[in-house]
Amino acid sequence: MAEVIAAERVEGSDKLIKLKVDIGDAERQLVAGIGQYYSPEDLVGRRIVMIVNLEPKTFMGVESQGMLLATDDEGQPVLLEPHSPVPPGTKIR
């Protein structure tokens, strides 16, 4: 579980958003292709489900240190979020 603490669009892309997230014991940066559906302002403060044990990847010159999880609703991504408040760093089982 992660909390989004900052978000901004990746320069030169309509789709990519760079997120700074708190994962409990550290902060990570990730890049997500959700910019056509979410604004950076809508993401700050949200708790999201993410995968943190991935090798870093670079998108348009920006390193991504994880991947957020989303489902699909008629072609639009819907972020997976907890039903109840849980602290950043909580493991998904």
Segments from the language model and where they lie:
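Phosphate-backbone binding interfaces of nucleic-acid-interacting proteins
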Residues: 1-93
